[in-house]
Amino acid sequence: MAAAVRSVKGLVAVVTGGASGPWLATAKRLVGQGATAVLLDVPDSEGESQAKKLGESCIFAPANVTSEKEIQAALTLAKEKFGRIDVAVNCAGIAVAIKTYHQKKNKIHTLEDFQRVINVNLIGTFNVIRLVAGEMGQNEPDQGGQRGVIINTASVAAFEGQVGQAAYSASKGGIDGMTLPIARDLAPTGIRVVTIAPGLFATPLLTTLPEKVRNFLASQVPFPSRLGDPAEYAHLVQTIIENPFLNGEVIRLDGAIRMQP
């Protein structure tokens, strides 16, 4: 029996951190392919204006991923507006560049900074996963038995963390580590879980760096020797949604880069 490849057309997708960068590009691609998108981001983001640009197929749901109350309210809003949730793309995250110990400054990494990154990137991702799984579990299964797809965002820093990335690497490594067990948890419900680990991408943060720095970073990518385009992240998201046999995987999207110390 041939497997049914699912189109994104007609699906409802929640994209956390969806107000900018590759995450906004993801929402734009999904809407362009006939899906409906819910941009979930913090209240002071550009989510409202970006959602309006995408038209009636997109709404903004203000929420902090670390808040159970706010995420549940955002998911309820999505279901009230569009009837169900088929896809969740977890992209919200923060980063700090702090050494564990800086000898010259005699400065020790604070627990507060470490906990803040873990709380947003790792616990925030799990918070969305568990709550959206509860919503997807109420969906009627498609002909292949699927009720939903959850896509998380890790980083190559999960595998080759750099100086000053202890907190960030730990948070992204946690997302990598929980992908398979959560996929196994949700398999009986018909919910797939896949994680993307991006390399160096042209995010709003990187594009503010001096051109010389951007060119150096791009030169570290074996092929193609450039920064990743947000559209390439969005393309992979669509591929994951449409391929029903992708489950429990962490996919590096990095041009074969392996970060050196």
From Swiss-Prot:
In terms of Pfam families, this protein maps to:
adh_short
The pathway entry for this protein reads as: Amino-acid degradation; L-isoleucine degradation; Lipid metabolism; fatty acid beta-oxidation; Steroid metabolism; Lipid metabolism; bile acid biosynthesis
The alphabetical list of record keywords is:
Acetylation, Fatty acid metabolism, Lipid metabolism, Mitochondrion, Mitochondrion nucleoid, NAD, Oxidoreductase, Steroid metabolism, tRNA processing
Active-site residues (renumbered): Y168 (proton acceptor)
Q: Which InterPro entries match?
A: NAD(P)-bd_dom_sf, Sc_DH/Rdtase_CS, SDR_fam
List every position bearing N6-acetyllysine. Answer: K53, K69, K99, K105, K107, K212
The EC class name is: oxidoreductase
N-acetylalanine modified-residue sites:
A2
GO terms (BP aspect): androgen metabolic process; bile acid biosynthetic process; brexanolone metabolic process; C21-steroid hormone metabolic process; estrogen metabolic process; fatty acid beta-oxidation; isoleucine catabolic process; mitochondrial tRNA 3'-end processing
> When this gene is knocked out, what is seen?
Conditional knockout mice are fertile but rapidly die around week 26. Mitochondrial morphology is severely altered in the central and peripheral nervous system, as well as in the cerebellum.
The residues the record assigns to binding NAD(+) are S20, D41, V65, C91, Y168, K172, F201, T203
Query: Where in the cell is the protein located?
Result: Mitochondrion; Mitochondrion matrix, Mitochondrion nucleoid
| EC numbers, comma separated | 1.1.1.35, 1.1.1.62, 1.1.1.239, 1.1.1.178
Q: Which SUPFAM superfamilies match?
A: NAD(P)-binding Rossmann-fold domains
List of residues binding substrate: S155
Q: Name one GO cellular component term.
A: mitochondrial nucleoid
What GO annotations for molecular function exist for this entry? 17-beta-hydroxysteroid dehydrogenase (NAD+) activity; 3-hydroxy-2-methylbutyryl-CoA dehydrogenase activity; 3-hydroxyacyl-CoA dehydrogenase activity; androstan-3-alpha,17-beta-diol dehydrogenase (NAD+) activity; chenodeoxycholate 7-alpha-dehydrogenase (NAD+) activity; cholate 7-alpha-dehydrogenase (NAD+) activity; estradiol 17-beta-dehydrogenase [NAD(P)+] activity; isoursodeoxycholate 7-beta-dehydrogenase (NAD+) activity
Catalysed reaction, written as an equation: a (3S)-3-hydroxyacyl-CoA + NAD(+) = a 3-oxoacyl-CoA + NADH + H(+); (2S,3S)-3-hydroxy-2-methylbutanoyl-CoA + NAD(+) = 2-methyl-3-oxobutanoyl-CoA + NADH + H(+); testosterone + NAD(+) = androst-4-ene-3,17-dione + NADH + H(+); 5alpha-androstane-3alpha,17beta-diol + NAD(+) = 17beta-hydroxy-5alpha-androstan-3-one + NADH + H(+)
Q: Which residues does this entry mark as bearing N6-succinyllysine?
A: K53, K107, K212
Q: What does this protein do?
A: Mitochondrial dehydrogenase involved in pathways of fatty acid, branched-chain amino acid and steroid metabolism. Acts as (S)-3-hydroxyacyl-CoA dehydrogenase in mitochondrial fatty acid beta-oxidation, a major degradation pathway of fatty acids. Catalyzes the third step in the beta-oxidation cycle, namely the reversible conversion of (S)-3-hydroxyacyl-CoA to 3-ketoacyl-CoA. Preferentially accepts straight medium- and short-chain acyl-CoA substrates with highest efficiency for (3S)-hydroxybutanoyl-CoA. In addition to mitochondrial dehydrogenase activity, moonlights as a component of mitochondrial ribonuclease P, a complex that cleaves tRNA molecules in their 5'-ends. Together with TRMT10C/MRPP1, forms a subcomplex of the mitochondrial ribonuclease P, named MRPP1-MRPP2 subcomplex, which displays functions that are independent of the ribonuclease P activity. The MRPP1-MRPP2 subcomplex catalyzes the formation of N(1)-methylguanine and N(1)-methyladenine at position 9 (m1G9 and m1A9, respectively) in tRNAs; HSD17B10/MRPP2 acting as a non-catalytic subunit.
Spell out the family assignment given in the record's similarity comment: Belongs to the short-chain dehydrogenases/reductases (SDR) family.
**Matching PANTHER family:** 17-BETA-HYDROXYSTEROID DEHYDROGENASE 14-RELATED (PTHR43658:SF8), SHORT-CHAIN DEHYDROGENASE/REDUCTASE (PTHR43658)
Quaternary structure (record): Homotetramer. Component of mitochondrial ribonuclease P, a complex composed of TRMT10C/MRPP1, HSD17B10/MRPP2 and PRORP/MRPP3. Interacts with TRMT10C/MRPP1; forming the MRPP1-MRPP2 subcomplex of the mitochondrial ribonuclease P complex.
- This one is known as 3-hydroxyacyl-CoA dehydrogenase type-2
This chain's source organism reads Mus musculus
Gene that encodes the chain: Hsd17b10
